[in-house]
């Protein structure tokens, strides 16, 4: 499947920074964080707790998958977050009842 035209694939310039991050987090997250440090005003989508903590320490803006879904609802792109939360729960993605309730409140569905 081909990617939409608005998707741009970038490579990290500073591979040493990425390798240092790989000592603490997975390659995907380390690559994303290293690239965010090279692209001003970027916002990462991170769900991994450790990666989010590192991004926060480095001053990188981030959100999670659920945050993207909430934003899509609030911007009128999707009518409801509930079906997406249900799909997420069918995967190995862990979402607590507390986080789900918070998401529903933020999306004005509770």
What are these regions (language model features)?
Residues 63-74, 78:
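Short alpha-helix plus adjacent loop in nuclease-associated cores
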Residues 93-97:
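Long, amphipathic alpha-helical surface segments
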Residues 50-51:
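Alpha-helix capping/helix-boundary segments
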Residues 45-46:
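Short beta-strand scaffold positions
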Residues 1-42, 58-60, 70, 83, ...:
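Active-site-proximal, substrate-binding regions of enzyme catalytic domains
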Residues 76-77, 92, 108:
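Short glycine-centered helix-capping/turn motifs at secondary-structure transition points
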């Amino acid at each position: 499947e081909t990617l939409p035209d608005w998707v741009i694939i970038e490579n990290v310039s500073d591979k040493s920074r990425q390798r240092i991050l790989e000592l603490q987090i997975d390659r995907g997250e380390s690559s994303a964080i290293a690239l965010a440090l090279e692209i001003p005003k970027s916002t990462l989508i991170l769900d991994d707790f450790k990666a989010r903590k590192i991004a926060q320490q480095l001053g990188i803006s981030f959100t999670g998958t659920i945050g993207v879904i909430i934003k899509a609802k609030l911007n009128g792109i999707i009518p409801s977050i509930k079906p997406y939360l249900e799909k997420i729960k069918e995967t190995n993605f862990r979402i607590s009842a507390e986080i789900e309730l918070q998401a529903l409140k933020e999306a004005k569905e509770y």
